[in-house]
Amino acid sequence: MTGAGPAQAGPFRYTLAMHPIQVIERGREDYQPCFDAMRAFTVARTPETPDQVWLVEHPPVYTLGQAGDPAHLLAPDERIPMVQIDRGGQITYHGPGQVVAYLLLDLKRRKLMVRELVNDIEQAVLDTLAAYNLAAERKPGAPGIYLSDGPHRGAKIAALGLKIRNGCSYHGVSLNVQMDLAPFLRINPCGYAGLETVDMATAGGHWQDQPVTAAQQPDIARRLAAALCEVLAAREARALAADKTAATPALAS
């Protein structure tokens, strides 16, 4: 399978916090070279390397986490390869009509715990969905985002998986915009048998009076990137304020 290489759009930079984030729009890209590039970036980075968020759309591919069980691929499709990778989690599907955001962050520099990063990613997805009038929620013990209302209540709309290496993250989150959902029927998504998977268009998402379509995917991707940068900046600002408070001597009464 041959796909287009990284697009030339970007990078652009969010400078809301002490540690700015570069956002790279890579366009449609085959999974394996993108995965290789993430690992190479993480291995080569130094304490001065800027953090990045990559926005990507992949041709059809199943990815299986490092501890994943291949049995969760229920009905293999010779047209869709499966790639074993080093993120956490089980099996998921990537394909056209889905926004994928990879977070290449120095967690040590940001003083950010992995659980905090997962929470921030989920919050960014919730904020993005809310902008398109979709109500969603977290589920304890099941990373990702699920619809909380409507006929598809409980269906998964965003999947999340990370790898931490030397205090730096890669991999990230995928958000279904308007896509062929049939490949999800061939797997137990994220290892959960019978879990429904949905996209923003099927769920009735809309921006003002315009229903979500694949044509809005670039805007949705940028909105998600902005939300990710905003929640990370907000956490950084809170931590900085707490540090300043702790460093301020108490006044004698």
From Swiss-Prot:
Enzyme Commission number:
2.3.1.181
**CDD domains for this protein:** LipB
Catalytic residues in the record:
C190
Quote the catalytic activity from the record: octanoyl-[ACP] + L-lysyl-[protein] = N(6)-octanoyl-L-lysyl-[protein] + holo-[ACP] + H(+)
Q: Where in the cell is it found?
A: Cytoplasm
Q: In which pathway does it act?
A: Protein modification; protein lipoylation via endogenous pathway; protein N(6)-(lipoyl)lysine from octanoyl-[acyl-carrier-protein]: step 1/2
Q: Which InterPro entries match?
A: aa-tRNA-synth_II/BPL/LPL, BPL_LPL_catalytic, Octanoyltransferase, Octanoyltransferase_CS
* GO CC terms, sorted: cytoplasm
Has the keyword Transferase been applied to this entry? yes
Q: Where is this site: Lowers pKa of active site Cys?
A: K156
Residues that, per the record, bind substrate: R87, G88, G89, Q90, I91, T92, Y93, H94, A159, L160, G161, G172, V173, S174
What is the recorded function of this protein according to its Swiss-Prot or TrEMBL entry? Catalyzes the transfer of endogenously produced octanoic acid from octanoyl-acyl-carrier-protein onto the lipoyl domains of lipoate-dependent enzymes. Lipoyl-ACP can also act as a substrate although octanoyl-ACP is likely to be the physiological substrate.
What family is it from?
A: Belongs to the LipB family.
Protein name per Swiss-Prot or TrEMBL: Octanoyltransferase
Native source organism of the sequence: Cupriavidus pinatubonensis (strain JMP 134 / LMG 1197)
Name of encoding gene: lipB
